[in-house]
Amino acid sequence: GSFELTILHTNDVHARLEQTSRDSGKCTGEDCYGGVARRATKIRQIRASHRNVLLLDAGDQYQGTIWFNYYKGREVVHFMNSLRYDAMALGNHEFDNGLNGLLDPLLKNVKFPILSANIRPKGPIASNISGYILPYKIINVGSEKVGIIGYTTKETPVLSNPGPYLEFRDEVEELQKHADKLTTLGVNKIIALGHSGFMEDCRIAQKVKGVDVVVGGHTNTFLYTGSPPSNEVAAGNYPFMQLSDDGRQVPVVQAYAFGKYLGYLNVTFDDKGKVIKASGNPILLNKSIQEDPAVKAEISRMKVQLQNYSSQEIGRTIVYLNGTTHACRFHECNLGNLICDAVVYNNLRHPDDNEWNHVSMCIVNGGGIRSPIDEQANNGIITLEELTAVLPFGGTFDLLQIKGSTLRQAFEHSVHRHGQGTGELLQVSGIKVVYDLSQKPGKRVVSLNVLCTECRVPTYVPLEMEKTYKVLLPSFLAAGGDGYYMLKGDSSNHSSGDLDISIVGDYIKRMGKVFPAMEGRMVFSAGSL
């Protein structure tokens, strides 16, 4: 007979353990979403009312709130174990604290398999991690065997810190090898679970023979059938049906991000393991779903240490960090310089023969800098609390690949209505821009020079319109915020990075004392006075 399987799935939760606001920031009012206590309730209800349930995570549990800064993944282990996840695929952010920060706490302490078929250890560390990262796992669900194969984005070495001894191989080739192996072992129901983005998920569904369902992540893709329940706009139906090269309809799913939804897919297989029906929708975890009291109590208990942590000294400033509105929205501000310098530092990777680094430029919208830090108050001591006042939105600094012409367009947008105190003026690092405000909007950029990367002595050189550049920027801008529609990244050119306050905090800690200056990174030419 046929076999009905219910797949519950999360991806890109990014340390949202507590419930959040509608846009996945701090929950302040009544209208709150997600959080692990609320997810626990929904999972319990579905396990009680459905026979064959799998709970899967497609990676990027790590990084995104102060929970991760403090607990470093112990919080992920604790709550994923208590929610009884069946399997997790590794995302790029699981490597943010290096291989050691992945091994312990995560790999050594979870009670479920961690999967990735396309990561190949080489050299000295191969023995340390053998047995901790599996290519696939066969799970008994009811009377049937289900094979789950994991995969992780090939971009991980550029996006995170996996170190020199892990090789990230082509997803389709590696998945095919393991799908063939599972088929040989007599497993005819196979799920690919991984973290390479929606376009790659679809390519896997199209190319890999034997894979019946693809559960993905990385691009925070929201799929929905019918009219969406909140403010996310659907990129396609749920499940998205991809026609495979061998003529099958393969359901592909993703559940947005930040634990705001719980992915819910019902799949019916015939006795040969062929998918005959697939339906479902992500479930919005809004306040109509009660938070599980036991889980909620554990969150409260663990939160106490967070509060102590956020009031500890990180470092000091010996100058006024001007993050005022009338500075950062009108001209260069030294706090903007500090933030962007920290972001470039955070993205230093292994240099190669061509480049001292893969990226040299950062931009941040002045409106995203929400508070100054006064060096005369409290001896200039900087804590995480102060940084959270400067950068309160819990955003990340992401990597975008764009053409020079697009970057120039962004700098025109930066001053298209200069003087009104709007938030789009760009603070920078690795960029020198000259504006002439006497010109018409759209024609105000006099010159735009950028720091070379393919050079042994970094120098500012003119931006080339046709060349592709990498730029670091707030996730808010990569989503087209503040009118920067030209920067709206699609999954092929945009990768999410680390939490803003943790980047700036780590930099200040490393420096001990900071004294950012006004450096003429942004200049208004005489014609505009």
Curated annotation (Swiss-Prot):
The keyword Ion transport does not apply. Venom 5'-nucleotidases (or a part thereof) may be released into the venom via exosome-like vesicles. They may be attached via a GPI anchor to the membrane of these vesicles. Soluble forms of 5'-nucleotidase might be released by cleavage of the ectodomain in the exosome-like vesicles or venom gland cells. Residues 526-529 form a propeptide. It is found in: Membrane. It is a lipid-anchor; GPI-anchor. Residues 1 form the signal peptide. This is Snake venom 5'-nucleotidase.
